[in-house]
């Protein structure tokens, strides 16, 4: 993903986590907050408890690629943080991962033309 489409600073992540809404899909969680910009930005969190550096980087790369492929469908004006919650994300088939990400984006209502569901957590 291009640098302009990524969250970079801890303050940006904290704002999304604090002000945004949360949707949970078991292995992956999404926090999303409006950003008043013409673009949507994404960030990715993979905790150390999910495995060593190789596993964490593999999860981060795979989730980032799934989001990159779906990015044209995402409406502008959102900041999103994807939080990996399972080491299985490193091993599941990529089409399954892509479907999981797409389902989260649709539930959050950030896909162009989608309507948001009630979040799992506030």
Swiss-Prot record:
This enzyme's EC code(s): 3.1.26.5
Q: Which domain of life is it from?
A: Bacteria
Which reaction does this enzyme catalyse, per its entry? Endonucleolytic cleavage of RNA, removing 5'-extranucleotides from tRNA precursor
Q: Which GO terms describe its cellular component?
A: ribonuclease P complex
* UniProt keyword list: Endonuclease, Hydrolase, Nuclease, RNA-binding, tRNA processing
Q: What class of enzyme is it?
A: hydrolase
Reply yes or no: does the keyword Methyltransferase apply: no
Gene Ontology terms for molecular function = 3'-tRNA processing endoribonuclease activity; ribonuclease P activity; tRNA binding
Q: Which cysteines are joined by disulfide bonds?
A: none
Q: Which InterPro entries match?
A: Ribosomal_Su5_D2-typ_SF, Ribsml_uS5_D2-typ_fold_subgr, RNase_P, RNase_P_CS
Q: Note one Pfam family from the annotation.
A: Ribonuclease_P
Q: Name one GO biological process term.
A: tRNA 5'-leader removal
Which PROSITE patterns does this UniProt record tie to the protein? RIBONUCLEASE_P
Q: Which family does it belong to?
A: Belongs to the RnpA family.
* Subunit details: Consists of a catalytic RNA component (M1 or rnpB) and a protein subunit.
Return the PANTHER family for the record.
RIBONUCLEASE P PROTEIN COMPONENT
UniProt-listed HAMAP family: RNase_P
What task does this protein carry out? RNaseP catalyzes the removal of the 5'-leader sequence from pre-tRNA to produce the mature 5'-terminus. It can also cleave other RNA substrates such as 4.5S RNA. The protein component plays an auxiliary but essential role in vivo by binding to the 5'-leader sequence and broadening the substrate specificity of the ribozyme.
- What is this protein called in UniProt? Ribonuclease P protein component
